Each structure stands twice: as C-alpha cells, then as structure tokens.
C-alpha cells in the first residue's frame, strides 16, 4: 500500500524516501543551513526528501534539558523551510491541541513512540486527515502495531506510515530486530515501513540524564535495515554533533551525508531491482 505526500510516493516497493533533518529546532539559521544541505544532496542523488525536525522535545529526561523553540515559533520556521525549498515537512505532536495548527503547516504528523497508545492524541491526529507516521514504541512487539493502526483507521484516517526505532533490550539499551520489519508489513496490510536509524542508536547511562549514542554504527545498522525492502529511512544530522542540544551522540555529522546516502541508495536500488522472493 503506497502513500502519497505532495507527489512523493512512500511505499515498500518504491524508491526509498529520506525523512531527514535535525532532532530539534535550535534556531532559524541552523535549520535552513541543515535543510539546504539535505536538499542539495538528495537532489543530486535523486532521492525523494521530506524535512524532519521537532519544535518541542516534550519527553526529555531532565526538566533542565533543552526542549525546542515551541509550537508558535516552530511553525514559523517550518513555513520558511517550505517557502524556501518547496519540500514537505514532518514533525511530531505531544498533545491533542497541537494537532490542527501543525496540520495546517506540516504535511506529515508524527506520533511519538512513548505516546503511541494515547487514544485522545490518536483521535486528534486522525481528525486532521494528514499522513501520520507512527513510531513503534520500544516496549511493543512489531505485531502489536496493528492495534495502533486499527485505532487510527477507526478514527477515520488510514494514511499511515510505520516507523521502527528499536526495542528495549534489558536496561538502558536498544536493539533492532530485523525480522520485525516484515512482521509489521504482514500484520498491518503492507503499510509503508520506514527505519529511524538515529534513535535506534541511543544508549542510556544510569549516571546521566542525557542519552548516549553509537553513531559510528549508523551506516551498518541503516544498511541492515534497508536490505529488508523498506519505504524509507529516518535520519537526523547536525553540523557539529558535539554542540547539538539533543541526541548529539546519535546524530550523523552533516558533512558525511552524501557519502552515507550514496551507499544507502545503492543498496535500495539493488534490492528493489529484483522481484520479491517468497519462501513458504
């Protein structure tokens, strides 16, 4: 089942779509700088592109951690991104009252993993009629995603994308079950499945409120996931990850973006040049 976003086809058998950008909006200049580089690289490589950023990181571990520029300022920045680059935008919401204002600016609304079972939020998101990206919670199995999908459908919106972002593996660690991509496709009617490689690289340190990360393994993990015939890749970057205000240890350094995507596209082209082989 394919989803259309401003002329971009998102489907498991279509060329992969990049949902990429920054973790959280820091200011207008850095946002435009990052987006401009993504646009330049993806146009050069012929990769469909949707810009990603959060206006608010509402689930930070510490009350003192940076959260973002807020809804009002965030929507102004997204409007400038769309006006300057002519590309679709995806962002996440955390409360029902945010859904309609976000839907008026952004093309895709994201349901955060920690909030994926919140019925009031699901209903408000569904009511917008926008395409929805559902992050798979770390605490749910891939097959349980069908319950969230059904909730959206019964609320009136079947324009859904499913996003893997790792599963809890004991304490303070995430792993990605590569078999889970196929399970989500099979149990959810072959909805588009994308892979958030950035957040799958997170680690936790019991002595710190900040997340750690393993960005050195980003390419290995991304290639492994994309080999399962996915609709897209979800990727966060930063011009200088050491200075990022959120999740810097998992962010891909912006200057490596082109070399990274060359490898992802080569694999995606190879996988999708072959017919699906069904093994019973």
UniProtKB/Swiss-Prot annotation:
Record's keyword terms, sorted: Cytoplasm, Lipopolysaccharide biosynthesis, Transferase
Subcellular location: Cytoplasm
GO biological process entries: keto-3-deoxy-D-manno-octulosonic acid biosynthetic process
Residue ranges that the Swiss-Prot or TrEMBL entry lists as coiled coil: none
InterPro entries: Aldolase_TIM, DAHP1/KDSA, KDO8P_synthase
Keyword hit for RNA-binding: no
Domain of life: Bacteria
UniProt xrefs under Gene3D superfamilies: Aldolase class I (3.20.20.70)
Entry annotated with the keyword Metal-binding: no
Catalytic activity field: D-arabinose 5-phosphate + phosphoenolpyruvate + H2O = 3-deoxy-alpha-D-manno-2-octulosonate-8-phosphate + phosphate
Example of a GO cellular component annotation carried by this entry: cytoplasm
Similarity comment: family membership: Belongs to the KdsA family.
NCBIfam families membership: KDO8P_synth, PRK05198.1, PRK12457.1
Protein name as it appears in the record: 2-dehydro-3-deoxyphosphooctonate aldolase
Natural source organism: Neisseria meningitidis serogroup C / serotype 2a (strain ATCC 700532 / DSM 15464 / FAM18)
